[in-house]
Amino acid sequence: MKKAMKRLLAATSAGAVLCGSLALSSLLGSSTTLTASAATDSVADQTKVGTLGIAGGGFVSGIITGKNVMYARTDVGGAYKYNYDTGNWDQMLDDLNDSERGFLSVDAMCIDPTDDDTIYLLCGCAYFSDAKTEIFRSRDGGKTFDRIDVTDLIQVHGNGEGRQFGEAISVDPDNPNIIYCGGDVASGDSALIMSKDGGDTWEAVKGYDDLGLFKNSIKWPTWTEHMARALTDAEYYHQNGVSIVHVQDGKVYVGTTIQGENSLVVADVGSDDFQPLSKDLPTNSYPSRINVDADGNLLISYCGSITFSGGGALYK
């Protein structure tokens, strides 16, 4: 049951159920169209589907799985770890005080692929806690956290539009000291940052900024004089910036909430040379999640809107 439930939740977090019918297209040329009902029937043959209780917590915007663990994030209610013994989700951020409630908006999270107990949470809310953005790092499965303030580099609004999109932070499986992370807006030299020391320090990835995507100056949030660079001139809660980051096999993949060929780009880890991943990918919708199947293939989901509407597609 544990493995079956993990398969179901992993499929959910890949964006398969968020986008209606799924158009599964191979970048190698072949394609298959799957209906939502066919996918449901396939899963139903292998799993028992029920509900899991979370005692409070807002909209569950993402679920990630490791080898033997599951974590969930919410838009205003913190982050949780699933307890297989009790069948409950245990809150990991319940020690935050009222002045820190902005960090209960968890915009993205990831697990170190080499260690289920090492997790990273990208936290921030534009209208609480002085609009600060921090990365929470735990090396003991969420029992305790170190906190790294990255507000001067990027900022996120974990309760904004697009919060259901996938994880904008990723650890390099080949070198877990290398981590990439993306923001909704850039408050420094790039909306994409990286760490080379396991999250202790962070720096701007200027090659991503050279794509020229974040060229609008907006107030963050609206009623302040603090300025940030954004994809559009819309207000802060409409900004979704970097939607996904994924590191795999020496490559870093970065999805951005824009239309056009630069909505999904790739570079070698450590390189500043970002290029469009493929001309065969959609240019009229937004990359929402990236996952990897059992054979190591990339699964990329797209959504037609950063709100809760629009069609979608899944590419392999």
Where are these predicted regions, by residue range?
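Bacterial Sec-dependent N-terminal signal peptides
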Residues: 1-12
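Extracellular glycan-interacting surfaces
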Residues: 5, 18-20, 27-30, 34-316
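Sec-dependent N-terminal signal peptides
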Residues: 11-22
